[in-house]
């Protein structure tokens, strides 16, 4: 069928005569004359030919018309994860955390190697230095406070030789001891009491039986508060004074402070 059309089209065009509106352009292309014929003759053909020539020299009109801009499309799906980035710099130090719970007790430690048992010098410096020792020079009798006026030691200056009393300045536990020589020869006895604030805390007795002299002695450990007084008082009899021989003595010292 295509072969028949190719053969017939040139025959029809050539038989149309001078009034025909078809020409063969090339071998197979056919262009219609858009202008009507003006009349017979060469003039009409010439005008149509000029118009056809002008029409064929211009570019064909575009059949594409630009429409309005469309709406934005839908958001696409997320792409695949990218590769890991470079390691960033260290961040600032955070605030301190809350205090944790106490941990479990640890296992017992290994036995120590042991030492010589010597007391460190720090122990000596922490104990207050309070101590005194005094002897009785002059004889006493009756119910007097014995005034041991021959003072040998008085660390801390807590003992007063004029009154025969020890006054506590540092509360703590103290040790006191006394020895009083009785002056006899008349068959009497002697009692010597250690008193704290006037109350008897220890007593001693010496009796004149077959000899003229005898000793009364005792010792105590007392807790003292600041201002407490400790002294030795006769409760009858005679106490012998030894000049500088210290036959009768009174002493004491602090064991430890409060």
Swiss-Prot record:
The UniProt-reported impact of residue 28 to A is:
Does not affect heterooligomerization with C1QL4
The compartments listed are: Secreted
- As given in the record, the signal peptide range reads 1-16
Q: Where is the composition biased (Low complexity)?
A: 67-77
Example GO biological process: maintenance of synapse structure
Q: What main location does UniProt list?
A: secreted
GO CC, one annotated term: synaptic cleft
| Record key words, sorted | Collagen, Secreted, Signal
Which part of the chain is the C1q domain?
125-258
Which InterPro entries would you find in this protein's record?
A: C1q_dom, Cerebellin_Synaptic_Org, Collagen, Tumour_necrosis_fac-like_dom
Q: Where is the composition biased (Pro residues)?
A: 78-95
Pfam families from the UniProt entry: C1q, Collagen
| Summary of the tissues where the protein is detected | Expressed in brainstem. More abundant in areas of the nervous system involved in motor function, such as the Purkinje cells of the cerebellum, the accessory olivary nucleus, the pons and the red nucleus.
List the residue ranges of the region (Disordered).
39-120
Collagen-like domain segment(s): 67-115
The molecular function terms in GO held by this entry are:
signaling receptor binding
Keyword Signal set for record? yes
Q: What does this protein do?
A: May regulate the number of excitatory synapses that are formed on hippocampus neurons. Has no effect on inhibitory synapses.
How does it associate, per the subunit comment?
A: Interacts with ADGRB3. Forms heterooligomers with C1QL4, when proteins are coexpressed; this interaction does not occur after secretion.
Write the protein's name.
C1q-related factor
Which species does the entry assign this protein to? Mus musculus (Mouse)
State the encoding gene: C1ql1
């Amino acid at each position: 069928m295509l072969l028949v059309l190719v053969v017939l089209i040139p025959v029809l065009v050539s038989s149309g005569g001078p009034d025909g509106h078809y020409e063969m352009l090339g071998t197979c292309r056919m262009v219609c004359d858009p202008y009507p014929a003006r009349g017979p003759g060469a003039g009409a053909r010439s005008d149509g030919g000029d118009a056809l020539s002008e029409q064929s020299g211009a570019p064909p009109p575009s059949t594409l018309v630009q429409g309005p801009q469309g709406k934005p499309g839908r958001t696409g799906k997320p792409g695949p994860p990218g590769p890991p980035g470079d390691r960033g710099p260290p961040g600032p130090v955070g605030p301190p955390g809350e205090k944790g719970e106490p941990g479990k007790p640890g296992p017992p430690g290994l036995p120590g190697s042991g030492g010589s048992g010597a007391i460190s010098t720090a122990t000596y410096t922490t104990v207050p230095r309070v101590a005194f020792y005094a002897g009785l020079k002059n004889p006493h009798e009756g119910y007097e406070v014995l005034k041991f006026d021959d003072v040998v030691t008085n660390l801390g200056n807590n003992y007063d030789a004029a009154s025969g009393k020890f006054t506590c300045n540092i509360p703590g536990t103290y040790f006191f001891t006394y020895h009083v020589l009785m002056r006899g020869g008349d068959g009497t006895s002697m009692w010597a009491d250690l008193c704290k604030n006037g109350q008897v805390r220890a007593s001693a007795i010496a009796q004149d039986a077959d000899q003229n002299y005898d000793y009364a002695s005792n010792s105590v450990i007392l807790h003292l508060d600041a201002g407490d007084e400790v002294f030795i008082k006769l409760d009858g009899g005679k106490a012998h004074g030894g000049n500088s021989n210290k036959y009768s003595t009174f002493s004491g010292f602090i064991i430890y402070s409060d």
